[in-house]
Amino acid sequence: MHLTPDHATRFATATLSHLGREYPYKMDLVLLGPEDAKPPRDHHPIFHGSFDWHSCVHGWWQILRLARRFPDLAVSADTRARADAMLVPEKVAGELAFLDRPYSATFERPYGWAWLLALHKEAELHDAPWAAALEPLALAFAQRFHAFLPKMTYPLRVGTHFNIAFALLLARDWARMRDPALATLIDAAAKAWFADDRDCQAWEPGGDEFLSSALTEAHLMAVVLGEDFTGWFDSFLPRAAQEQPATLFTPATVSDRSDGKIAHLDGLNLSRA
């Protein structure tokens, strides 16, 4: 599919319509007392829309990317104006303060962490102060990856937000030019968890998944292994040329798009494609 200006306008318009919409919003918050029962924007000065924190983060990534690719669209001007107002140091400081709360060490791990790094990387490609404002938040999540990966004994393979291969793909892309030690740590973790995987049975899809566990793992190993990937892949999915396992080549059935979890399967079909 070729991304046209019309597609870009429709995507960006839809996302802009909910980035600042505070309700409904699903908080990831441990209440320490009645004083914590505050509106979402009080806890998250930037990422308080789009139903939840990580959706707001990757919504920002989407509109910035579209604005860079199609800078002359009217909606791109709207995006830049919104970013000028929201991606500022004082609001980033509020997001950082939330990370310092008790019980926040696992907040948005690993999906939101990775998407924040992707957002920062995209912001760096714009002639604007947004990346500099976001940098302290990106560095905070990079440090969380540094602390977390060495103690993560087993990989999370589910096709939902907890999928570690997907998170490492985004984090590695950010780290390669900004934190080589983190990139090295990611490569070592990927090899430790996945290098010996053979004859994947692809027990997917799960009922509410939006990622292919098998294909996301393969994508990560492609960037980690480089020229050694072909041999690994031939052992990991030895019958892929025969479209086996068949489940990987069969679109998922989405029985009820009004169900927010089941509707994830639309995302699975898109991410597989």
Q: Model-derived features: where do they sit?
A:
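Low-complexity, Ser/Thr/Pro/Gly-enriched N-terminal "stalk/linker" regions
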Residues: M1-H48
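Solvent-exposed loop and edge beta-strand segments that line ligand/cofactor-binding
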Residues: L3-P5, P40-V57, A97-A114, K151-I164, ...
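Long, well-ordered core segments of solenoidal/helical folds
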Residues: F11-P24, D78-A97, Y103, E135-T153, ...
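Alpha-helical solenoid scaffolds in large eukaryotic transport, assembly, and signaling factors
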Residues: H18-E35, W53-S55, W61-D84
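Extended ligand-binding groove/face enriched in aromatic
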Residues: V57, L66-W174
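Amphipathic alpha-helical elements of HEAT/ARM-like alpha-solenoid repeat scaffolds that form extended
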Residues: W60-I63, L116-H120, A167-R172, L211-A222, ...
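Loop-centered beta-sheet repeat module
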Residues: R144-E217
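Accessory, usually C-terminal, subdomains that scaffold auxiliary metal cofactors
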Residues: E209-S212, L220, G226-L248, D259-L268, ...
